[in-house]
Amino acid sequence: MADNTVADVKKLSFERAIEELESIVKRLEDGKVPLEESVTIYERGEALKRRCEELLRQAEARVEKITTDASGRATGTAPLDVQ
């Protein structure tokens, strides 16, 4: 895949990347795409998948739970334990 295509994928928001990835999956599942084009869009799909995973990891790292005092007022944040 061309470097400019990878750079293009790195600029996409999560929503845009997942939307395009879903479109690629549908096209490949339909089976009406010529072989060479299938390979090309599959490669782009892989790059989109990696982008979505990267953005999800970043979001997960930023998620924090709000801590409160006895009266229920927010007192700060702490890392969210997702286990």
From Swiss-Prot:
Location (main, coarse): cytoplasm
Gene3D superfamilies documented for this protein: Exonuclease VII, small subunit (1.10.287.1040)
InterPro entries to which the protein is assigned, alphabetical: Exonuc_VII_S, Exonuc_VII_ssu_sf
Domain of life per record: Bacteria
GO MF assignments: exodeoxyribonuclease VII activity
GO cellular component, one term: cytosol
Disulfide bonding pattern of the chain: none
Reaction catalysis annotation: Exonucleolytic cleavage in either 5'- to 3'- or 3'- to 5'-direction to yield nucleoside 5'-phosphates
EC number: 3.1.11.6
Localization terms from the record: Cytoplasm
Keywords from the UniProt entry: Cytoplasm, Exonuclease, Hydrolase, Nuclease
Biological processes annotated in GO: DNA catabolic process
Catalytic class of the enzyme: hydrolase
NCBIfam families reported in the protein's UniProt record: PRK00977.1-3, PRK00977.1-4, xseB
Assembly with partners or alone: Heterooligomer composed of large and small subunits.
PANTHER family: EXODEOXYRIBONUCLEASE 7 SMALL SUBUNIT
Similarity comment: Belongs to the XseB family.
General function of this protein: Bidirectionally degrades single-stranded DNA into large acid-insoluble oligonucleotides, which are then degraded further into small acid-soluble oligonucleotides.
Protein name: Exodeoxyribonuclease 7 small subunit
Provenance organism: Bradyrhizobium sp. (strain ORS 278)
